[in-house]
Amino acid sequence: MTGPIVYVQNADGIFFKLAEGKGTNDAVIHLANQDQGVRVLGAEEFPVQGEVVKIASLMGFIKLKLNRYAIIANTVEETGRFNGHVFYRVLQHSIVSTKFNSRIDSEEAEYIKLLELHLKNSTFYFSYTYDLTNSLQRNEKVGPAASWKTADERFFWNHYLTEDLRNFAHQDPRIDSFIQPVIYGYAKTVDAVLNATPIVLGLITRRSIFRAGTRYFRRGVDKDGNVGNFNETEQILLAENPESEKIHVFSFLQTRGSVPIYWAEINNLKYKPNLVLGENSLDATKKHFDQQKELYGDNYLVNLVNQKGHELPVKEGYESVVHALNDPKIHYVYFDFHHECRKMQWHRVKLLIDHLEKLGLSNEDFFHKVIDSNGNTVEIVNEQHSVVRTNCMDCLDRTNVVQSVLAQWVLQKEFESADVVATGSTWEDNAPLLTSYQNLWADNADAVSVAYSGTGALKTDFTRTGKRTRLGAFNDFLNSASRYYQNNWTDGPRQDSYDLFLGGFRPHTASIKSPFPDRRPVYIQLIPMIICAALTVLGATIFFPKDRFTSSKNLLYFAGASIVLALSTKFMFKNGIQFVNWPKLVDVGFLVVHQTHDKEQQFKGLKYAQSPKFSKPDPLKRD
């Protein structure tokens, strides 16, 4: 069991120990400011001088180019309680250097900015007494005590940061209490009453550490079978039936993840990037589904991408590999979301359930156990032996709607199994509970979307209210515009922050040359500045003319600035790939970088181009 921690920072480094009331565990963790790194000391070596700071959790340690740092969760807020366990969301973080008041160079400062960016944008959750990385069903199999040793590595977000601590813990079990697995996603519960039965309804979403990243920089599958934007979402329910004196606990798992083939959308400043497909991905796809079958059993694949236009090649590529696998445990269904739900008839998504039932999916396939008043398991009534894996292009907006509808369908059967709702009645008649349910799923949708796309989810008006509205459509327009800006100009650093935090890039083992300087040709770097200058001149001639706007001098400036603006903008969009803010730490896989030279073979800069391993679908059918 873990708990709050205190630390002292001085000239010798940072010293950590458990807060008071933790029994006989007197271990002190010392993150030294020299090459010794992490050490385990006795209680007598905890500093008696210096400010003692109490924190919620130690997320772990990271070594950058020059120094080591502790990543700390300072403050938290409670987001839920379930069967006696409290869920917390991290509110405030700190990055503490081992070198007290030390100066750092510009490269080290950039790495620290990336860490701060990741901590600022992320939603981290944990529980001192419950393992949030595992589902209720998996936790039942590994035992009641929360421990990093049984945590699911896929969702152990600070797995890399705790590497030193985990190595020590293999020899010294006292260190276990310092290792707090954290998930990135969503975790919240709400209390309600349904037909005089007290219930707790909750939602937990866990983002995978493998192939993690942003919308356009982590698509498809990698050679190890990991896919972009993979999330496991668990709907949990506790119902205390006063008549039978039984406490029922339920769990229903769903997954989402990018289409498991080699594909990408290459940003080029256009609203729809260039869609490209990679080489034969059958082996990687097989690895992905072999993993999913081992973890979840039968997989029901719900594909929501459009069947024409820009998205068609992805649909066809997915169906091709599923057909080639010919696996009896893989059940594929295509649902034309935009056609079936056209004109905002989003209730028609329930037609998908009919398709899934014909393939063999049952709303009785969930985990169900009975516990006593102390929270101990009395009986395992049922286990979940399959999973619905949903995807659209981004695995965000359409996917959110479908997952919430499926979970609503299963929740009805869970209430019936606990004798809370009679067969033939519906729990949706309870308006406060329905509102809580819809808000849980809408907030979850936003959390998943912000992590991947940088904005809240689209279509959450349907998830939140059960119907599509014009205001919701307008909010979707604003979010889409924000996504366009972020995906082209701010997601590069955000992807770098993922790769740095998760250990995909380790500065202390990297080359001497800093990855951060802009090495594009000078004229490429100047174009945005020229556009800004032209816009400034245009604004001045319109709003602050020296004489009147139609004076010859003013019109000359206006015409000149307009020509410069038009030519510069045309050049920029024609060569859009050169102006995207690409990640700098880890290769995205679908790009190659070329060195350019002048006639004297002097280096002029770096240019980006599409990798020859990827090609544009031909022909690409359009609307």
Swiss-Prot record:
<dbReference type="GO" id="GO:0000139">
    <property type="term" value="C:Golgi membrane"/>
</dbReference>
<dbReference type="Pfam" id="PF02383">
    <property type="entry name" value="Syja_N"/>
</dbReference>
<comment type="subunit">
    <text>Component of the SPOTS complex, at least composed of LCB1/2 (LCB1 and/or LCB2), ORM1/2 (ORM1 and/or ORM2), SAC1 and TSC3.</text>
</comment>
<dbReference type="GO" id="GO:0032541">
    <property type="term" value="C:cortical endoplasmic reticulum"/>
</dbReference>
<dbReference type="GO" id="GO:0005789">
    <property type="term" value="C:endoplasmic reticulum membrane"/>
</dbReference>
<dbReference type="GO" id="GO:0005739">
    <property type="term" value="C:mitochondrion"/>
</dbReference>
<dbReference type="GO" id="GO:0005783">
    <property type="term" value="C:endoplasmic reticulum"/>
</dbReference>
<dbReference type="GO" id="GO:0090156">
    <property type="term" value="P:intracellular sphingolipid homeostasis"/>
</dbReference>
<feature type="topological domain" description="Cytoplasmic">
    <location>
        <begin position="1"/>
        <end position="523"/>
    </location>
</feature>
<feature type="transmembrane region" description="Helical">
    <location>
        <begin position="553"/>
        <end position="573"/>
    </location>
</feature>
<keyword id="KW-0832">Ubl conjugation</keyword>
<keyword id="KW-0333">Golgi apparatus</keyword>
<dbReference type="GO" id="GO:0004438">
    <property type="term" value="F:phosphatidylinositol-3-phosphate phosphatase activity"/>
</dbReference>
<dbReference type="GO" id="GO:0005741">
    <property type="term" value="C:mitochondrial outer membrane"/>
</dbReference>
<dbReference type="GO" id="GO:0052629">
    <property type="term" value="F:phosphatidylinositol-3,5-bisphosphate 3-phosphatase activity"/>
</dbReference>
<protein>
    <recommendedName>
        <fullName>Phosphatidylinositol-3-phosphatase SAC1</fullName>
        <ecNumber>3.1.3.64</ecNumber>
    </recommendedName>
</protein>
<dbReference type="GO" id="GO:0043812">
    <property type="term" value="F:phosphatidylinositol-4-phosphate phosphatase activity"/>
</dbReference>
<feature type="transmembrane region" description="Helical">
    <location>
        <begin position="524"/>
        <end position="544"/>
    </location>
</feature>
<dbReference type="GO" id="GO:0061909">
    <property type="term" value="P:autophagosome-lysosome fusion"/>
</dbReference>
<keyword id="KW-0812">Transmembrane</keyword>
<keyword id="KW-0256">Endoplasmic reticulum</keyword>
<feature type="cross-link" description="Glycyl lysine isopeptide (Lys-Gly) (interchain with G-Cter in ubiquitin)">
    <location>
        <position position="246"/>
    </location>
</feature>
<feature type="cross-link" description="Glycyl lysine isopeptide (Lys-Gly) (interchain with G-Cter in ubiquitin)">
    <location>
        <position position="358"/>
    </location>
</feature>
<dbReference type="GO" id="GO:0072517">
    <property type="term" value="C:host cell viral assembly compartment"/>
</dbReference>
<dbReference type="GO" id="GO:0005797">
    <property type="term" value="C:Golgi medial cisterna"/>
</dbReference>
<feature type="topological domain" description="Cytoplasmic">
    <location>
        <begin position="574"/>
        <end position="623"/>
    </location>
</feature>
<dbReference type="GO" id="GO:0046856">
    <property type="term" value="P:phosphatidylinositol dephosphorylation"/>
</dbReference>
<keyword id="KW-0378">Hydrolase</keyword>
<feature type="domain" description="SAC">
    <location>
        <begin position="115"/>
        <end position="454"/>
    </location>
</feature>
<keyword id="KW-0472">Membrane</keyword>
<keyword id="KW-1133">Transmembrane helix</keyword>
<keyword id="KW-1017">Isopeptide bond</keyword>
<dbReference type="GO" id="GO:0017059">
    <property type="term" value="C:serine palmitoyltransferase complex"/>
</dbReference>
<dbReference type="InterPro" id="IPR002013">
    <property type="entry name" value="SAC_dom"/>
</dbReference>
<feature type="topological domain" description="Lumenal">
    <location>
        <begin position="545"/>
        <end position="552"/>
    </location>
</feature>
<comment type="function">
    <text>Phosphoinositide phosphatase which catalyzes the hydrolysis of phosphatidylinositol 3-phosphate (PtdIns(3)P) and phosphatidylinositol 4-phosphate (PtdIns(4)P). Has low activity towards phosphatidylinositol-3,5-bisphosphate (PtdIns(3,5)P2). May be involved in the coordination of the activities of the secretory pathway and the actin cytoskeleton.</text>
</comment>
